Regions:
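Terminal alpha-helical segments
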Residues: 1-113
Length: 113
């Protein structure tokens, strides 16, 4: 059922050079417990890149790659959310753009799987 996605997330977590071992442990535990929002927060704390956090944030643990592609195709809907974050100054315009770029990059990765 989410086999391939779980492996990808595991690989991302294992291969990332983390700044904080505690945040890493918390991110992994939260992901395993299904608390994806907390997993993302902890992943950012552990120094994950925008692309890696996108993978966690959108937690599309799908039964098939085709389903994943369809779901990730909707990442373009993030643009209004990113705009809101920019206006609230929760994140810089550059960070918001990196998140959007990461979603496009991840779509390409999925297409090649």
């Amino acid at each position: 059922m989410g086999f391939h996605t779980n492996i990808s997330v595991g690989a991302v977590i294992q291969n990332n050079k983390l700044r904080s071992q505690q945040s890493y442990s918390d991110a992994l535990r939260a992901f395993q417990e299904g608390d994806y929002n907390m997993s993302v927060i902890k992943a950012y704390g552990a120094g994950f890149s925008a692309a890696e956090a996108i993978l966690l944030a959108h937690n599309y643990i799908a039964p098939s790659k085709r389903d994943m592609l369809t779901r990730f195709g909707h990442l373009r809907l993030m643009e209004p959310v990113m705009e809101k974050y920019r206006k609230m100054e929760v994140m810089s315009e550059e960070e918001a753009q990196r998140v959007l770029d990461a979603s496009e990059w991840f779509m390409e990765v999925l297409k090649r799987m």
